[in-house]
């Protein structure tokens, strides 16, 4: 299997604790957060990764090189910010498989990718989203499904419970080859939340371990927790 990891963001909210590093290079137990994503992908049978880089991409390339944890690495470099959607579209030009895993570089969600891939294929989905059940939260929006089909997205705000977008996807390459797609766009706002009615988007619910290091509090939480899951 093949995966795209989005590691090109500026990580502004984490600057107060990791000022000189790209967010996926934030250290946890003397290793960058991205190391743990590679560990996870290796366990899930991923053998090829495209790192979608931007901010301080040389630092990432120097550390990970062309092979890491038994996974071959190729690079898709943003010379200017393209948004998450533009970054994915550009990275897809370097992929070789029809269906590809996409992962946010600041999130670790230990979902069973093999089962998720089977579900994606069985539904003949355009896109499958890994969804994490949560209770009492306001940092995330929620994804509503009916018979696994995505039927709505609800905005961020207080939710007593719901399924959040866990930042792990399996996408059919064809949906990013559409000529109408801009070279710069947000994957979440401009694509997911606008295309789910026209395209076949499905949810894959998993209560596996999830951590998002996008803010200082959760980065500190990851430093305490990750050792128990790796």
UniProtKB/Swiss-Prot annotation:
<dbReference type="GO" id="GO:0016779">
    <property type="term" value="F:nucleotidyltransferase activity"/>
</dbReference>
<comment type="similarity">
    <text>Belongs to the D-alpha-D-heptose-1-P guanylyltransferase family.</text>
</comment>
<keyword id="KW-0808">Transferase</keyword>
<keyword id="KW-0119">Carbohydrate metabolism</keyword>
<comment type="function">
    <text>Catalyzes the GDP transfer from GTP to D-glycero-alpha-D-manno-heptose 1-phosphate, yielding GDP-D-alpha-D-heptose. Cannot use ATP, CTP, dTTP or UTP as substrate.</text>
</comment>
<comment type="pathway">
    <text>Cell surface structure biogenesis; S-layer biogenesis.</text>
</comment>
<dbReference type="InterPro" id="IPR005835">
    <property type="entry name" value="NTP_transferase_dom"/>
</dbReference>
<keyword id="KW-0342">GTP-binding</keyword>
<comment type="pathway">
    <text>Nucleotide-sugar biosynthesis; GDP-D-glycero-alpha-D-manno-heptose biosynthesis; GDP-D-glycero-alpha-D-manno-heptose from D-glycero-alpha-D-manno-heptose 7-phosphate: step 3/3.</text>
</comment>
<dbReference type="GO" id="GO:0009058">
    <property type="term" value="P:biosynthetic process"/>
</dbReference>
<dbReference type="InterPro" id="IPR029044">
    <property type="entry name" value="Nucleotide-diphossugar_trans"/>
</dbReference>
<dbReference type="GO" id="GO:0045232">
    <property type="term" value="P:S-layer organization"/>
</dbReference>
<keyword id="KW-0548">Nucleotidyltransferase</keyword>
<dbReference type="Pfam" id="PF00483">
    <property type="entry name" value="NTP_transferase"/>
</dbReference>
<protein>
    <recommendedName>
        <fullName>D-glycero-alpha-D-manno-heptose 1-phosphate guanylyltransferase</fullName>
        <ecNumber>2.7.7.71</ecNumber>
    </recommendedName>
</protein>
<dbReference type="InterPro" id="IPR050486">
    <property type="entry name" value="Mannose-1P_guanyltransferase"/>
</dbReference>
<keyword id="KW-0547">Nucleotide-binding</keyword>
<dbReference type="GO" id="GO:0005525">
    <property type="term" value="F:GTP binding"/>
</dbReference>
């Amino acid at each position: 299997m093949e995966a795209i990891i989005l590691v090109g963001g500026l990580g502004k909210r984490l600057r107060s604790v990791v000022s000189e590093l790209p967010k996926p290079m934030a250290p946890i137990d003397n290793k960058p957060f991205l190391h743990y994503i590679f560990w996870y992908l290796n366990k899930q049978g991923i053998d090829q990764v495209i790192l979608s880089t931007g901010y301080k991409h040389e630092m990432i390339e120097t550390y990970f090189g062309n092979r890491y944890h038994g996974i071959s690495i190729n690079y898709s470099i943003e010379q200017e910010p393209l948004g998450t959607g533009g970054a994915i579209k550009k990275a897809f030009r370097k992929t070789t498989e029809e269906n590809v895993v996409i992962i946010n570089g600041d999130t670790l969600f230990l979902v069973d990718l093999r089962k998720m891939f089977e579900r994606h294929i069985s539904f003949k989905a355009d896109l499958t989203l890994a969804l994490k059940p949560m209770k009492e939260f306001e940092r995330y929006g929620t994804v509503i499904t009916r018979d696994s089909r995505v039927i709505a997205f609800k905005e961020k705000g207080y939710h007593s419970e719901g399924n959040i977008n866990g930042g792990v996807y399996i996408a059919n390459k064809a949906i990013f080859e559409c000529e109408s797609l801009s070279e710069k766009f947000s994957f979440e706002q401009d694509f997911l939340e606008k295309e789910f009615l026209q395209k076949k988007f499905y949810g894959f619910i998993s209560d596996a371990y999830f951590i998002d290091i996008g803010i200082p509090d959760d980065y500190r939480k990851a430093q305490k927790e990750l050792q128990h899951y790796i």
